[in-house]
Amino acid sequence: MEEYAREPCPWRIVDDCGGAFTMGVIGGGVFQAIKGFRNAPVGIRHRFRGSVNAVRIRAPQIGGSFAVWGGLFSTIDCGLVRLRGKEDPWNSISSGALTGAVLAARSGPLAMVGSAMMGGILLALIEGVGILLTRYTAQQFRNAPPFLEDPSQLTPKEGSPAPGYPNYQQYH
């Protein structure tokens, strides 16, 4: 599967890093807004202030964590594309596993194995769903079979039975 909308590898890393940061800030912002609202003292003004404060403090941190994950994933993916010479789902699956392992390296080998498995499984699921969606949508755009004329709508040939009356023949 080739992805035609993707940037070339050096720019892909920057693009994925920025996209992951944005996704982390937005998703983390929503989550932190709800968390800050629920944990603030009673009163709408206090709850609103707690919500904004939680977003202001935590959303950039979450975005940064997502950016690190996206940048490392994209760097490993580009390295595998260069090493293997082809771009396929196995690169993404391997990149997810290696990214999980590298980011969990400070927690020890057992955490590295667990994170590698989770990263590989997560990316395998994402790639599998992408392949299924691509195949499903490709079926919608297949060429339709040619339209065949209905024989009952054609004009009768000389000496052939009239349409709708199989045993009736004209005599000359």
UniProtKB/Swiss-Prot annotation:
The keyword Metal-binding does not apply. It is found in: Mitochondrion inner membrane. One of its GO terms (cellular component) is TIM23 mitochondrial import inner membrane translocase complex. InterPro entries: Tim17. It is a multi-pass membrane protein. Disulfide bonds join C9-C78. This is Mitochondrial import inner membrane translocase subunit Tim17-B. It comes from Mus musculus.
